[in-house]
Amino acid sequence: MDPPTRPSVSGPRTRARPPPPEALPTVGFEEEVYDCLDYYYLRDFPASGAGRSKGRTRREQQLRTNYPVPGGHERKVAQILLNGQRKRRQRQLQPRPRTRLA
């Protein structure tokens, strides 16, 4: 019986041939030059400086913005009223100081 033959390790290896150029899909100039990230940066980031946008995209700016309230400074007015009520309550709880004139 003959021993089983092994393939030679040092022999030449065959490489897969690339497909002919006709079989490759044709791509336009923009698809060839730009990839997905390039389109992302071109579309979403504003043209102004980095300090103005805080590094956010336009979409993030629209989602996380403080919309102007048509009533004006409502929070400020409400805080002033609450502070006044708190002061009134504190004055009522404290006894009035005695003076010599009264």
Swiss-Prot record:
Pfam families: Phospho_p8
Region feature Disordered, mapped onto this chain: 1-26, 46-102
Keyword entries, A-Z: Cell cycle, Growth arrest, Nucleus, Repressor, Transcription, Transcription regulation
Annotated Gene Ontology cellular component terms: nucleus
Coiled coil: none
Listed name of the protein: Nuclear protein 2
Highest taxon, organism lineage: Eukaryota
UniProt function note: Acts as a transcriptional repressor by inhibiting gene expression at the NUPR1 promoter in a p53/TP53-dependent manner in cancer cells. Involved in the G1 cell cycle arrest, and in a decrease in cell viability and cell proliferation of pancreatic cancer cells. Plays a role as a negative regulator of the protumoral factor NUPR1.
Gene assigned in the entry: Nupr2
Compartment(s) of residence: Nucleus
Originating species: Mus musculus
Transmembrane domains' residue ranges: none
Keyword Ribosomal protein in annotation: no
Keyword Protease: no
InterPro entries in the cross-refs: NUPR1-like
Family: Belongs to the NUPR family.
